[in-house]
Amino acid sequence: MRTAMTVNARVASPKISILVSDLSKQGAGRWGGAVRTFLLAQALERIGARVKIYGFVFGDDPGEPTVSEVPMITVPGEYYPGFIGRSRALLKQLDADIIYALRPKPTTLGLALWHKRNTGCQVILDIDDWELSWHGGDRYRYRPSLKQLAQDILKPRGALRYPDHPLYLRWMESRVCEADAITVHTQFLQTRFGGVKIPNGKDTELFNPQAYDPQLSRQAYGLSDYRILMFPGAPRPYKGIEDVLQALDRLDDPTLRLVIVGGSPYDDYDQQLMQRWGRWIIQLPPQPVTKMPFVVAGADIIVVPQRETPAALAQFPLKLTDGMSMAKPILATRVGDIPEILQDAGYLVEPEAPEAIAQQIRWILDHFQDAQQRGASARQRCIEHYSIEAMSGLLSDVVRSLQLS
């Protein structure tokens, strides 16, 4: 475990329990140490907090963090009514001054507020996604027929027996204000829920381009014969991969390839992309976060082509800071916080604009030395504003404000 680093306004050593709805390999555990759960844990450790991660496991084994030694305590997840007993089992194990509930769900914020009522502990709510955006957002309504309602309640796997059913998510949004503090990671979420904006931090020591040889990376993954555009994440329609592939169709350059790192853990969308654009795609298997810098080292350009949807606006694209920290030229879209994060340290186009993407790819490759200098500026910006250290400083202020309240 790394020694806690000095940050401004260093806090005392509170015990902080991070509460996660699903730590399985289909949930927060699927990306190892790369997701916000583990980034928060790392950042809190660096301000001297004693951190443990608690959560449920729905369906399979818990994922293993690969960059952190923070203890993880898990309880098997279960549908109602069994979930009530599982919740009690988890809460009995909590030993915390502060519960850090991740997302406004019954399995996190609901349990945290219940524990606060019984013990007086303080609750921070972190919101790194708008859960209802996956169910229609503000338009979501649960209006079943009487027959459907009975099935949803009475069947062993009825919809309303799932602890985080969208109806319950909607109810939990009305209780966000009961948390003692709120943290978010995008402007969209801050506008919607309030709170302190704490962008995801990148481990810029791990993601240090000086530590990796791009040629060795290319050789290791069979990329040496191509100029590589890389999307180091799971493809989903709102992430705009199709726009890049259409741009490659326009360029029709056989030396170009789009490398997608990891498939979709949600559906067969990556296979749909392969069926239509397989000539341009090289797909690498999911990588542990400790291997990602070596993978990213092989890229010529990192692409972050988000489309302007509620899901995209709510999310902080971790692949953006992968590229920034590794000093790579970055081609991204003007969506959400991306322009603020990148500023002049990358290349921006409008969303869903394949022709503009194609033109920008050609310009970057034709002026690659200039693009590399811009990549170096991106790394410096990442260190200053989007590193684990920067995240720690912001978290320190939040924790101190609770300790002083």
What is each PLM-predicted segment?
Residues 188, 201:
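Carbohydrate-associated surface elements
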Residues 346-354, 363-369:
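Conserved acidic donor-binding segment of nucleotide-sugar-dependent glycosyltransferases
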Residues 1-68, 94, 181, 246-249:
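N-terminal subdomain of nucleotide-sugar transferases
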Residues 363, 370-385, 391, 397:
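A short, well-ordered alpha-helix in the C-terminal region of glycosyltransferases
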Residues 56-59, 202, 232-236, 257-270:
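Glycosyltransferase donor-sugar binding loop
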Residues 19, 222-239, 245-248, 259:
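Conserved donor-binding/catalytic core segment of Leloir-type glycosyltransferases
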Residues 31, 239, 288-295, 302-324, ...:
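Nucleotide-sugar-dependent
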Residues 270-293:
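Nucleotide-activated donor-binding/catalytic signature segment of Leloir-type glycosyltransferases, i.e.
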